[in-house]
Amino acid sequence: MATRAVGHGYRVHLLQLMKGGTSTVEDVRGEYNAIAALPGFSYENSGHYGWHGFHDGTDDDEHAARAKGGLARARELVEACRDADLTTPFDADAPADAGVHMLVIDEILYAANRGLVDPDEVRELVESKPENLELVLTGGHERPEYVTGLADLVTEVGKEEHPIEAGQGARKGTEY
């Protein structure tokens, strides 16, 4: 969906929650390399290294603080779109704060389902979305009712099995 939007000259920004860190494989995450090659597609993350729920040496407070920071950043980006003129093409190198056509907030539903951010605040974010913005929320194993009630489009990608369940680590090109 995001690459389709970029292909039509729209600006897209990916804000990832739950993923982050320095000096890790996540610094060279494949999607970041691909995004960097696409004009008009930008990204940032506000996650903590490791994945919430796994033994990564962090606690819920650290993950929650990062997730709440990500939600606050999402609010800023949504607000920036409210006043942006998105009817005409604009500089592909402009920062996301100048407004984007599509904002993808990766893993925000997972963060809400795990109690790292307040689900009501996520719902309020969706309700505050200006008409000129395509807002994409991902993550979670349970779709909150408000998503279905407020969304124009709902799709689902679900895990049937995962290599980590068999003790395999993350695989380059597949998971990062």
Specify the residue positions occupied by each region the protein language model found.
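Phosphate-binding/switch loop-helix module in NTP-utilizing enzymes
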Residues: 53-131
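Conserved nucleotide-binding/hydrolysis micro-motifs of P-loop NTPases
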Residues: 18-21, 49-51, 109-110, 141-144, ...
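Sensor-1/coupling segment of RecA-like P-loop NTPase cores
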Residues: 127-145
